[in-house]
Structure formats: structure tokens, C-alpha cells
A protein has these predicted regions:
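Unusually extended, aromatic-enriched hydrophobic runs near protein termini
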Residues: 4-23, 27-29, 149-156, 163, ...
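Alpha-helix-loop-beta-strand connector modules within alpha/beta enzyme cores
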Residues: 1-10, 14, 18-24, 117-136
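Catalytic alpha/beta core domains of metabolic enzymes, predominantly
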Residues: 40-42, 46, 51-182
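Catalytic beta/alpha-barrel core
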Residues: 3-12, 27-39, 94, 112
Length: 182
């Protein structure tokens, strides 16, 4: 029997509902965000009643009506809005929220993406300062997309280390492609 929470990942609320109804134990919903707002017909507004009914935890992405948050300030602003609504309106425990501050490829050659990794690290640090009980997670390898495999391994390893130092609690990584850092 599985004792770890199962993460249900779908953009369709009816798929999440089917999973929640069939799985024993506690689940984590991946994900909630404000991409299409927070009204009752938004995805957020349709998913959150399911989360509340089943006592699920959530992965909260730093995406709002303007798009995917790129700067540390924007990421923290969206995360704070999500945390405040999830704990205030929906009665969730802050420890049941896993904020994904998102990271983006930094090797695109475009000036506007050069600081994306730093912005993510700074957002994690500030978020953990403001909300010590919140959990954080991150898809680490997004930062190195487009690089050759050897460069990806090095960048992913260093980036993961820096994110953990900033307060990252969990990460989505290919463990065989991470170098130990001390």
C-alpha cells in the first residue's frame, strides 16, 4: 500500500474529481493558479471546492491573469495572493501549500531571460521569509532547457543547490543527472 500522497495533475477539474474520489488517502492537486482569474467559473474556482471537500494539498503556481511571473517581486506577489486566499477563504493550512515559483530557460540568448534563475532564487528566499510554514517546489531542469546534456547537468546541480540554500523544500529532478554539491 502507498503511504505517500499521490499527486494528481490535470487541467480538467472533472479528471481531478475522478482521481480524488477513487484514491484512498490524501492527494496533492497539481496545480492551482490565477491564469484565468479566481471567479467561480475560473479553473481555480472550479478546483478549490474539490480540494476543500477532499482535504487535498495543492501545488500553487505563480501564474496570474497577466501570465507566468518572471520577476521575484511578481512571483512573491502572486504567491502571497494565492496563500492568503487558500488559507483565508478556503481554510487551508499553510503547510499544505507547495508554491512553485517557476523557472525558465536562461540560455535563450534573449536579454530578458538572463536573470530568470536569479529571480526564482530570490523569490524562494523572500517567500520563505514571509511565510516560514509554506512549502516550495520547483521543476529544476527548466532552467537549463536548450543546453547540451553536460552543461544541463552542471547548471541544474548548481541551480538546485542555490535554490535549496534559499529555502526550496522539494524539487522535480532526474536524480541521476544531479551532481552532489557541498
Amino acid at each position: 500500500s502507498v503511504t505517500m500522497p499521490i499527486v494528481l495533475d490535470s487541467t480538467e477539474p472533472q479528471v481531478l474529481q475522478a482521481g480524488l474520489e477513487r484514491l484512498a488517502g490524501r492527494c496533492i492537486i497539481n496545480s492551482v493558479n490565477y491564469e484565468d482569474g479566481d471567479g467561480p467559473t475560473s479553473r481555480f474556482g472550479r478546483v478549490m471546492p474539490l480540494v476543500a471537500e477532499h482535504g487535498a494539498a495543492v501545488v500553487a503556481l505563480t501564474i496570474d491573469e497577466e501570465g507566468q511571473a518572471r520577476t521575484a517581486e511578481w512571483k512573491v506577489r502572486v504567491a502571497s495572493r494565492l496563500i492568503d486566499e487558500l488559507t483565508g477563504t478556503w481554510g487551508m493550512n499553510v503547510g499544505d501549500i507547495l508554491v512553485d515559483c517557476l523557472t525558465f530557460p536562461i540560455a535563450t540568448g534573449q536579454e530578458e531571460t538572463r536573470r530568470d534563475g536569479i529571480e526564482t532564487i530570490e523569490a524562494i528566499r523572500e517567500l520563505k521569509h514571509r511565510y516560514p510554514g509554506v512549502r516550495t517546489t520547483l521543476g529544476v531542469s527548466n532552467v537549463s532547457f536548450g543546453l547540451n546534456p553536460a552543461a544541463r547537468m552542471v547548471l541544474n546541480s548548481v541551480f538546485l543547490h542555490e535554490c535549496v540554500e534559499a529555502g526550496l523544500d522539494s524539487a522535480i529532478v532526474h536524480s541521476a543527472k544531479i551532481l552532489p554539491m557541498e
